[in-house]
C-alpha cells in the first residue's frame, strides 16, 4: 500500500491508512468528472515521482475552456461537477455523495448499515501571463461509517456434509474519517524547452 503513489496535476496526494476490511473506505481520491488524462506506470518511472517501488498513478485535471458541467445520480448517491473560464482564469469544482447501505446489506454479516461519504474538490488556475501560471488544488473528504451488527451466518463443508455457523453480535461500530488537502503551485515557462515549478501543500486527517 505504501509503495503506490497517486499524483494529481504533479502534486502527490497523501491518503490515510484505511481499515483493512475495505467496507469503511468511501470515495476514491480521484473525481472522474474532473479528469482530463490518466497515466499509469508499474515501474521504471522518472525520479520526479520519488522513490516508491511499486506503481505511480498520475492524474491531470481539466482546465475548462468554457462553462461546462456534469451530473449523475443513482440509488447510492450522486455527483455534480461545474467549471468555467475566462481568458486568464479557470475553475473547476466537483461534489460527490455516496451511501451504499443497500450494497453492504447483502454481505454475510447482517445488521444496520449507515455509511455516508462526502467529497469536495476544486481546481483553480490563474494565468497572469503566457509564462506564469498559478494553480490551486483542494480536497475535502468526510466519511461517516455506522454499523450495528446483528448476526453472521457462515456456511462451510462439502455438498454431502454441509455445516452452518451462526454468530450473534452485541455492540456497534462508528468510524469517522476527515481529510483536508490543499496545494498551491507556481509554474514558470521561459521558453518551449524549459519549465520550472514551485509547489507547496498541506495535509490533515482526523480518524
Model-derived features with residue positions:
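Solvent-exposed coil/turn segments that connect beta secondary-structure elements
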Residues: 1, 11, 43, 62-64, ...
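Short acidic/polar hinge/loop motifs at secondary-structure boundaries
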Residues: 11-40
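Outer-membrane beta-barrel and related beta-rich outer-membrane complex signature
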Residues: 18, 105, 135, 140-156, ...
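Extracytoplasmic loops and strand-loop junctions of Gram-negative outer membrane beta-barrel proteins
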Residues: 19-23, 40-41, 62-65, 103-108, ...
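Flexible, surface-exposed loop regions and adjacent strand-edge segments
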Residues: 23, 109-113, 150-164
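N-terminal periplasmic accessory domains that precede
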Residues: 24-28, 40-43, 47-69
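Transmembrane beta-barrel wall of Gram-negative outer-membrane proteins
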Residues: 76-97, 110-148, 172-204
Amino acid at each position: 500500500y505504501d509503495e503506490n503513489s497517486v499524483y494529481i496535476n504533479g502534486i502527490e496526494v497523501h491518503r490515510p491508512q484505511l481499515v483493512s476490511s475495505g467496507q469503511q473506505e468511501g470515495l476514491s481520491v480521484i473525481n472522474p468528472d474532473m479528469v482530463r488524462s490518466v497515466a499509469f506506470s508499474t515501474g521504471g518511472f522518472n525520479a520526479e515521482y520519488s522513490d516508491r517501488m511499486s506503481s505511480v498513478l498520475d492524474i491531470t485535471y481539466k482546465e475548462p475552456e468554457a462553462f461546462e458541467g456534469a451530473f449523475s445520480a443513482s440509488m447510492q448517491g450522486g455527483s455534480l461537477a461545474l467549471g468555467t473560464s475566462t481568458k486568464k482564469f479557470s475553475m473547476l469544482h466537483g461534489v460527490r455523495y455516496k451511501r451504499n447501505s443497500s450494497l453492504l446489506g447483502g454481505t454475510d454479516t447482517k445488521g444496520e448499515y449507515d455509511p455516508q461519504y462526502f467529497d469536495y474538490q476544486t481546481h483553480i488556475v490563474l494565468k497572469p501571463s503566457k509564462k506564469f501560471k498559478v494553480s490551486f488544488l483542494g480536497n475535502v473528504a468526510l466519511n461517516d461509517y455506522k454499523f450495528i451488527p446483528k448476526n453472521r451466518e457462515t456456511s462451510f463443508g462439502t455438498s454431502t456434509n454441509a455445516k452452518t455457523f451462526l454468530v450473534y453480535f452485541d455492540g456497534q461500530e462508528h468510524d469517522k474519517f476527515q481529510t483536508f488537502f490543499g496545494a498551491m503551485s507556481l509554474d514558470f515557462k521561459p521558453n518551449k524547452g524549459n519549465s520550472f515549478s514551485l509547489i507547496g501543500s498541506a495535509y490533515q486527517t482526523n480518524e
